[in-house]
Amino acid sequence: MSVVVGSGFSAAPSAAAGAADAAHDAHLALGGAPCDVALVFVGGDLVTEPAEALRVVQEILDPTELVGTTAGGLIAGEQEHEQGDGVAVWAISLGDEGRAEVFELHTTEIEDGIALSGIPAVELGATSAVILLADTAHLPLEATLNAFAEHLPGVPVIGGVPSLVPPDGRPLLRGLGQSTAAGLGIRFEGIEVLPLVSQGARPIGPELTVTAGEGAVIRELAGRPAIDVLRDTVDSLNEDDREQIRHGLLLGLVVNPGQPDYGPGDFIVRGLAGADPESGAVVVGAPVTVGQVARLHVRDPQTATTDLDDELALRRTATGSARVAGALAFTCNGRGSDMFGHANHDAEAIQAGLGPLPLVGMISAGEIGPVGGRPFAHGFTATLAVFLA
């Protein structure tokens, strides 16, 4: 038996009614196959009733593992429900060879900082992918993803940060209630999962080498104060690119050096978090190393559309003769109708590129996905976990 995915969504006025409608649709799509894992996404005002949604999904799907999260917006099918109440359910039957393990990440304050526990200890090569839901109010995400890169090297980690936290509650859900974990993960093995990260940013200007810096601070680019080099680079751009820069200055850092050419997928893109005019240093949202290649980037709707379409086409090619069983999506709350001028942009693109397929996910306050084989936290991205049958 192969992998089967079912999904459902409902905008019913109560969590129980919405969960019933969504879970019934997912159950029908499974076609009698057992549910190994069910994910529940609860949105809008219904985030105050997560236990009701979980109880109903448990009754209808009887999953071996039940996890979920609250969210400010939901993705289901060809639609992005950026606002309003709703429940989305995603269910997977892993077939004869697949297995799934749900794990919890917990943090503890220690004298030198924070200790992280809960990353699975498994043999190298045993894990196909990890889906990660991260409560960043309690989880240092960058440090956590570095730990994943160390303990599960090469394993794609895909997920998101809840964009709506219930009043006086926690956003992560497991079993029949809220979880106290800082992160919830699902580790899959024995099945094939393709990750996709569309940062939607276009490189502009010349490549620049970091010649002095440490931590997240770049002091020099190409042997000169970083702020001076960036100012000169912006001045040399054409008028259209300078206009895009006004919406936010972005810097891409090459993840895997030593290639003859670097394209959009080779950079981790970050905004500039600060600058010191006296020293000429700039601060970026990622660690830097001397010798690393950097390049200015711009983000605009056309670039984001083209990049997502290109990434989807690559995944379609990578599937070969295999069938896509379903997908989980995590897209930024800075995309959607505000960025593209119309609703459902990413969901429609995913269905056009890989579908029709069962698709569920959430509009996130941060996305998680691999670049250059390492997991990173992102903003303004569309990230996807594509499950093959």
Whereabouts are the PLM-identified features?
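Small-residue-enriched flexible segments
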Residues: 1-51, 56-59, 63-65, 69-340, ...
